[in-house]
């Protein structure tokens, strides 16, 4: 079981099935989903099924981002080990009304710190669509730097994005 983590403004905790309605607020929002690799969730029950799959592997770490002041769940994210390429990558998504306030950087920074200490991680990677300026800013604030141009497609193949890979060495 993942430990609960805290930052100045957030409580980071494992997501549960009971979070499905809150998670649907961003998983079902086309503005949030625009650059995500998964297809837009059409209903909350599908989000509940997704939540059942989280944190079943100790090297696939997902947290919910909860505002301390209100107890509101505003996003999720984590760090993930990819055995086939022997790398760790970060990922995140945040409710639209929480954008631009530094929450993602705050949360992912704490999650990286936890995973780095737990698994002795030496470097992390992140990929973002070139048009996703907010995600670029998050990675830069985390101290990540440009590695290479790339591209990625949604799981259903409906769209392919020009992208950039960023990296941070510890």
Where on the chain are the PLM-derived regions?
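A short helix-loop-beta-strand connector motif used in the catalytic cores of GNAT acetyltransferases and
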Residues: 52-64
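Acyl-donor (CoA/ACP) binding surface of acyl/acetyltransferases
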Residues: 1-34, 62, 66-170
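Conserved GNAT-fold acetyl-CoA-binding loop/helix
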Residues: 31-52
């Amino acid at each position: 079981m993942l430990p609960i983590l805290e930052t100045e403004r957030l409580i980071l905790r494992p997501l549960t099935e009971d979070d499905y309605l809150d998670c649907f607020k961003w998983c079902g929002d086309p503005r949030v989903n625009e650059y995500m690799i998964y297809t837009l969730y059409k209903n909350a029950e599908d989000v509940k099924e997704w939540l059942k799959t989280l944190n079943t592997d100790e090297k696939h770490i997902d947290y919910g981002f909860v505002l301390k002041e209100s107890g509101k769940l505003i996003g999720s994210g984590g760090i993930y080990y990819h055995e086939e390429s022997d790398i760790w990558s970060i990922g995140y998504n945040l409710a639209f009304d929480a954008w631009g306030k530094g929450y993602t950087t705050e949360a992912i920074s704490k999650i990286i710190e936890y995973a780095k200490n737990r698994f002795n991680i030496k470097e992390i990677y992140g990929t973002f669509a070139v048009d996703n300026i907010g995600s670029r800013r998050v990675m830069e604030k985390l101290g990540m730097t440009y590695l290479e141009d790339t591209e990625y497609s949604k799981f259903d193949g409906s769209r392919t994005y020009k992208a950039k890979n960023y990296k941070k060495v510890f």
